[in-house]
């Protein structure tokens, strides 16, 4: 998908790119940096929760990205596994079917993500609780993702994974 998008954007902007340029860009996902707070936050959350990934990348790219996160996920479901990309309903159906077979009911899922379009809108449609990591809180728009239309409902909203961890720690202290 990324090589096609790269080619179309280059054409739209009047930039010449070769087929190899497009393929190389598509393979670059595994080299993209993780958000600075993600490894530590995920390692902390892993102590308390099962962690599952529903990703819009292929398996090879995810493996390279995951090496930067330094956490063992309980399950990983990629677009390559599913055969489609979020926000397609099939991705969420696939994840929920797999989680159910692992004994995890959808009522126990907290879908945590940044993209309103790719994640929170379909999470709403499947009745999942959701947590918006609103990293663009100081900026307008939705970044590289499409506007979701109407704003989906979210159960929690944090500006970073670090803020999510702080809220969890505060909740534990208050018990």
Feature locations, PLM:
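Catalytic-core regions built around general acid/base machinery
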Residues: 37-48
């Amino acid at each position: 998908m990324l090589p096609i998008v790269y080619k179309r954007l280059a054409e739209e902007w009047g930039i010449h790119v070769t087929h190899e340029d497009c393929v190389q860009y598509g393979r670059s996902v595994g080299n993209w940096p993780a958000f600075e707070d993600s490894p530590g936050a995920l390692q902390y959350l892993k102590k308390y929760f099962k962690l599952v990934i529903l990703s819009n990348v292929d398996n090879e790219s995810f493996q390279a990205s995951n090496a930067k996160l330094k956490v063992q996920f309980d399950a990983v479901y990629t677009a390559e596994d599913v055969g489609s990309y979020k926000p397609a309903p099939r991705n969420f159906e696939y994840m929920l079917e797999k989680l159910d077979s692992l004994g995890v009911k959808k009522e126990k899922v907290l879908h945590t993500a940044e993209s309103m379009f790719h994640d929170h809108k379909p999470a709403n449609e499947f009745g999942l609780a959701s947590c918006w990591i609103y990293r663009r809180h100081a900026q307008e728009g939705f970044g590289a993702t499409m506007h979701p239309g109407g704003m989906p409902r979210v159960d929690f909203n944090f500006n970073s994974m670090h803020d999510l961890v702080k809220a969890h720690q505060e909740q534990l202290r208050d018990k």
